[in-house]
A protein has these predicted regions:
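Glycosyltransferase donor-sugar binding loop
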Residues: 216-231, 246
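Nucleotide-activated donor-binding/catalytic signature segment of Leloir-type glycosyltransferases, i.e.
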Residues: 230-248
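Membrane-proximal helix-turn-helix segments that form the acceptor-binding/catalytic region
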Residues: 112, 134-151
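Conserved donor-binding/catalytic core segment of Leloir-type glycosyltransferases
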Residues: 2, 183-200, 204-212, 218-220
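Conserved acidic donor-binding segment of nucleotide-sugar-dependent glycosyltransferases
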Residues: 300-311, 319-325
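N-terminal subdomain of nucleotide-sugar transferases
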Residues: 1-51, 210, 363
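Short hydrophobic beta-strand element within catalytic cores of glycosyltransferases
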Residues: 285-289
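Aromatic "clamp/platform" in nucleotide-sugar-dependent glycosyltransferases that forms part
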Residues: 268
């Protein structure tokens, strides 16, 4: 089986340790999926990336990299270059994650050329036919739904949204990672990790740190296109017990989760945060202001969701810091949850099974 995995734009930092380009969870997930496909004997995988340099890259032997187009190319130029690459490769399936106009056009293209298009939703907003960052309606979304062979969602909310609003069925496959044999949690500080975005509400973590001078806080917040980043950084620097970090290379970010006592999420909404996976795989309990996909924090007792209340978030932070038995219980459950639900090897096998079943049905 020949599979082409398309990495989202801004993925160059995953292939160059010196790059300061900011990327998100969708980039990491497609990188992990492509890497694991490369280890599967039954799959001939090609990883399609933008036309940029791939230097200082330790895992080159695990990828068959194919350069396609520049991010600055017009959409029809992208399509022409992409068309030529796909005609050379002749894949059985194409995987893509993260909603863009290109996604919808690609679904139509694959339908015309008899290629199974597998679309993976990156956030809850996408399942409602809206772009993740802007919230604007994706006008060509129905083209994607009508022509994609397989839709993969991250949680039951996304699956239900697609079914109720658009009559399309999907398959839940959660984010995956290469997991550890035992938890690494060391419990040194309270951690927040996300790019600068109004949806992530970073100012609330700064507020939390300022209210708790007895503990050390670390905030990894790379800049983005969102305004007022310098103002945020200056505000953070005024809080003595808060360390504000502008950038951490992809290969080093796991160390921050290993040493964290608690991970805090202040986002308005997300699909399944990549950071939840990074926290749980290290046995780090989670405090979330609002985000709780499939009620996993409460259902699996791996943290607390505070239903939008900063006061409750404060109370739960105090509780986790003062109750050693509760903390150890949640830490162990967090690690066990990741082992059962987020093994990239198991997830990739599920994707292969879906594509194989679809191919058999198609023929």
């Amino acid at each position: 089986m020949k599979i082409a995995v398309i990495l989202p734009s801004r993925s160059e930092a995953l292939f160059d340790k010196t790059s300061k380009v900011i990327f998100g969870g969708a980039n990491v997930q497609m990188y992990q999926i492509a890497k694991e496909f490369g280890q599967c004997d039954e799959v001939d995988c090609y990883t399609l990336i933008g036309d940029y340099e791939t230097t200082n890259f330790d895992e080159r032997d695990k990828f068959n990299l194919i350069k396609t187009f520049r991010d600055t190319d017009r959409i029809f130029v992208k399509f022409w270059k992409f068309h030529k690459k796909l005609q050379q490769l002749k894949p059985d399936a194409v995987l893509q994650r993260g909603l863009t106009a290109f996604s919808s056009l690609l679904a139509v293209y694959c339908k015309i050329y008899g290629i199974s298009f597998v679309y993976m939703f990156a956030s809850d907003t996408e399942a409602g036919g809206r772009y993740q960052e802007s919230g604007k309606r994706a006008r060509l979304f129905k083209w994607l739904l009508a022509n994609a062979r397989i839709l993969i969602t991250q949680n039951t909310y996304q699956k239900g949204m697609l079914s109720k609003q658009f009559g399309r069925e999907s398959h839940i496959i959660r984010s995956g990672f290469y997991l550890k044999d035992e938890p690494q949690n060391q419990g040194d500080y309270v951690l927040w990790v996300a790019r600068h975005s109004h949806l992530k509400r970073p100012e609330l973590f700064i507020e939390l740190a300022s209210q708790n001078p007895q503990w050390h806080f670390k905030m990894v917040c790379p800049p983005s296109l969102a305004p007022n980043y310098d103002d945020l950084a200056q505000k953070a620097k005024k809080v003595k017990n808060l360390e504000f970090i502008k950038f951490v290379p992809f290969g080093n970010i796991d160390e921050y989760f290993e040493k964290a006592k608690v991970f805090v999420n202040t986002s308005d909404y997300e699909g399944f945060p990549q950071t939840f996976l990074q926290a749980t795989m290290n046995g780090t309990p989670i405090l979330s202001l609002l985000v709780n996909p499939d009620s996993l924090l409460t259902e699996h007792q791996i943290g607390f969701c505070c239903n939008g209340s900063m006061q409750l978030l404060q109370e739960k932070l105090v509780l986790l810091s003062s109750d050693a038995d509760l903390y150890q219980t949640m830490s162990k459950k967090a690690f066990n949850y990741a082992q059962l639900n987020h093994d990239i090897k198991k997830n990739v096998k599920k994707i292969i099974s879906l594509i194989s079943a679809n191919s058999a049905h198609k023929h």
